[in-house]
Amino acid sequence: AKELHFATDAPRAVFLIRQVGHSDVATVDVLAGMFPDKMQDFVLSINESDVAVIKQITGGTTPEDLEKIAKSMEDTLKNELRIKTVIGIGTVSDHLRELADSYKEAQTAIDVGKVFDTEKSIIDYENLGIGRLIYQLPTTLCEIFLSEVFKKNSIDSLDQETLFTINKFFENNLNVSETSRKLFVH
């Protein structure tokens, strides 16, 4: 870091941009054009679908500010290259040695978001909540829990009206009041 003349203890955010569907090699160039300061911001090609952006930020940068940066990257790639992306944001690292952890967190954010929040294209590691905890559980423990909660043939024992109500509940994004309006329940 000393030989390259950049600060080791500056706050930085890691954004992992994953291209969904088709990938474009020009993604790195487009992102590098968005962050031209090569001494503070770094754009790294990880593999054919992933690009990491390490952005130096100020001390007062909020999670909302990070989401705005991610949104601008998403919009630029969508408009210029017609690429659909999912962006994971790691926690802010205050030192160079913490960047690897932040990168892993950005990866985890994408993986957890793929399972628990498929609608979002920008996922912040700090906002994963209980999904992060569940994601880290061993598969066998999840299978045991599911087999205890959902007994064999339990869905078969439900009548048609109950199944209809459950389907409406999911169609209305788990919104009880909207479901009751649709079912005329008062």
Where are these regions (language model features)?
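Cytosolic nucleotide-utilizing catalytic cores of signal-transduction proteins
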Residues: 2-186
